[in-house]
């Protein structure tokens, strides 16, 4: 049986890579526009799903990133945007 300490390794990501962010917002149009304004580069944005009550919509945003720092910066910038409720 594996122990928790056996999983204490950082995942190695090879860059450049296309990274998928799951972005959730209340207004579909504003959420898409927010993703586009934050990334400011070619981004494939696809609708993922709507919450059970219809209040939230989620999108997949596939973006080419060239480093860990760039990937983290995009994540933080998406999180800070007023029209985005959550980023995974």
Task: Report the location of each language-model feature.
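Long, contiguous binding/interaction regions
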Residues: 1-58, 64-88
